């Protein structure tokens, strides 16, 4: 089994969907390793726009079987709603090519209610979650009180565990705007509907042990990783290479490619440190031209310049074999383009390839930039590297050199599926 892993290298929203969609055309199997319906990306295929959250992007390819893996958390109503939406847009038979590990955890409406209450208690220190209940669900998993997807099939066990969760949160928060019996009633219907989708992950993988091409689709990104990201302003799962290997029980020796997806600039949704953020006309222009609004929340994304310190750190953890640089065309109309090359701490220490663990330190670094000339010409839809303006090629090659020679193999030049340069 040859395994390709696609990972976000910044704070998410890098455009992982397009490269995953492209690679899935040759894949036998596409897997989601972590996260839940908090993730979001868009794929444009045959002029139809598909929004993905919990489902793997490989569903767009009619020959690709898809798995929601053991490290994920599954909001069952969202699973069925998203599947119906995809089938309604023409992806017929998608429901026969999607499976869920019985070891994945169930994200309940209860978790969404608790998510909102926890954010409200934090006040000005809130994390800026999507409000989907992902954090509380992973908290229950870590505390060994969560409900696994496979347990939905045992009605008595399922109902006992959900009522216990509800009782615990009621003791903590008081009366909740949530009806546990109503949710239990909904799962009486979901129980039978879920039967065709639930699988033993290891047994499932044995069916594909001879697959020449397995694709792993990362959700979120390295800087949102629970261990390696800008803690506590992170998601609640392991979003890097290690998380994918763990959640899907992958053989590291079978990994042939690790693709880091990076925007040609940097964005972030929600709260937390963002050293290269531009709270000025440059940030506004990046946001406007790049149409930077979250697929899941609709929130305006914060925007800033490309951050080499962040990307060197991300590469050191995820060990990328190649990069996909996305949204190059957004930079077409800039006279000059800045790249963050170092952080300077308050005591004068200069960092170039490590990221401070302390969020307070992250908030107070000063970024040292280099300024590169813009190209002031249209790159939208360009498909050959040699057709890019010289300064655009220089920008890409500068990033390659500064990241230790990791090749930028794919370059996104627009939203359409074929707006992509593939460098051999």
From Swiss-Prot:
Residues where substrate binds: 295-301
Residues annotated to bind IMP: 13-16, 38-41, 130, 144, 220, 235, 299
Co-factor: note: Binds 1 Mg(2+) ion per subunit.
Subcellular location: Cytoplasm
Binding-site residues, Mg(2+): 13, 40
Molecular functions per Gene Ontology: adenylosuccinate synthase activity; AMP binding; GMP binding; GTP binding; magnesium ion binding
Positions of GTP binding: 12-18, 40-42, 301, 327-329, 412-414
Listed InterPro entries: Adenylosuccin_syn_GTP-bd, Adenylosuccin_syn_Lys_AS, Adenylosuccinate_synth_dom1, Adenylosuccinate_synth_dom2, Adenylosuccinate_synth_dom3, Adenylosuccinate_synthetase, P-loop_NTPase
Active site per database record: 13 (proton acceptor), 41 (proton donor)
Keyword Metal-binding among UniProt keywords: yes
Pathway: Purine metabolism; AMP biosynthesis via de novo pathway; AMP from IMP: step 1/2
Pfam families: Adenylsucc_synt
CC per GO annotation: cytoplasm
The organism's place on the tree of life at top rank: Eukaryota
Keyword annotations from UniProtKB, A to Z: Cytoplasm, GTP-binding, Ligase, Magnesium, Metal-binding, Nucleotide-binding, Purine biosynthesis
Principal location listed in the UniProt entry: cytoplasm
Swiss-Prot/TrEMBL GO biological process terms: 'de novo' AMP biosynthetic process; cellular response to cadmium ion; IMP metabolic process
UniProt function note: Plays an important role in the de novo pathway and in the salvage pathway of purine nucleotide biosynthesis. Catalyzes the first committed step in the biosynthesis of AMP from IMP.
NCBIfam families: PRK01117.1, purA
Annotated PANTHER family: ADENYLOSUCCINATE SYNTHETASE
Record note on quaternary structure: Homodimer.
Name of the protein: Adenylosuccinate synthetase
């Amino acid at each position: 089994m040859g395994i390709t892993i696609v990972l976000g290298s910044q704070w998410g929203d890098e455009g992982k969907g397009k490269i995953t969609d492209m690679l899935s055309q040759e894949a036998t199997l596409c897997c989601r390793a972590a996260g839940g319906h908090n993730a979001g990306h868009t794929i444009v295929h045959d002029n139809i726009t598909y929004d993905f959250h919990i489902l793997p992007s490989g569903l767009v390819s009619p020959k690709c079987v898809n798995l929601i893996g053991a490290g994920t958390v599954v909001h069952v109503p969202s699973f069925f709603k998203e599947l119906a939406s995809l089938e309604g847009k023409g992806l017929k038979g998608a429901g026969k090519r999607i499976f869920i590990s019985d070891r994945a955890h169930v994200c309940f409406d209860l978790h969404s209610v608790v998510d909102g209450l926890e954010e409200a208690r934090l006040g000005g220190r809130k994390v800026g979650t999507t409000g989907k209940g992902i954090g509380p669900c992973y908290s229950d998993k870590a505390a060994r009180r969560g409900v696994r997807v496979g347990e939905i099939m045992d009605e008595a066990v399922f109902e006992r565990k959900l009522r216990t969760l509800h009782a615990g949160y009621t003791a903590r928060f008081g009366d909740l705007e949530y009806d546990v019996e109503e949710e239990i009633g909904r799962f009486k219907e979901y129980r039978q509907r879920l039967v065709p989708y639930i699988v033993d992950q290891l047994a499932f993988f044995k069916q594909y042990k001879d697959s020449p091409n397995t694709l792993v689709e990362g959700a979120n990104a390295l800087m949102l990783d629970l261990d390696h990201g800008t803690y506590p302003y992170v998601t609640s799962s392991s979003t890097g290479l290690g998380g994918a290997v763990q959640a899907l029980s992958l053989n590291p020796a079978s990994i042939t490619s690790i693709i880091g997806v990076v925007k040609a600039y940097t964005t972030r949704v929600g709260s937390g440190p963002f050293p290269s953020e531009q709270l000025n006309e440059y940030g506004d222009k990046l946001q406007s031209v790049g149409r930077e609004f979250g697929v899941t929340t609709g929130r305006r994304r914060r925007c800033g310049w490309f951050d080499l310190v962040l990307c060197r750190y991300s590469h050191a953890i995820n060990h990328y074999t190649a990069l996909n640089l996305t949204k190059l065309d957004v930079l077409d109309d800039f006279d000059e383009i800045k790249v963050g090359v170092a952080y300077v701490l308050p005591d004068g220490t200069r960092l170039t390839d490590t990221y401070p663990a302390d969020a307070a330190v992250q908030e107070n670094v000063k970024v040292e930039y280099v300024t590169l000339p813009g190209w002031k010409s249209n790159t939208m839809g360009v498909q050959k590297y040699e057709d890019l303006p010289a300064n655009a090629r220089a920008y890409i090659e500068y990033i390659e050199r500064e990241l230790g020679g990791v090749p930028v193999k794919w370059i996104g030049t627009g939203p359409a599926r074929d707006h992509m340069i593939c460098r051999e």
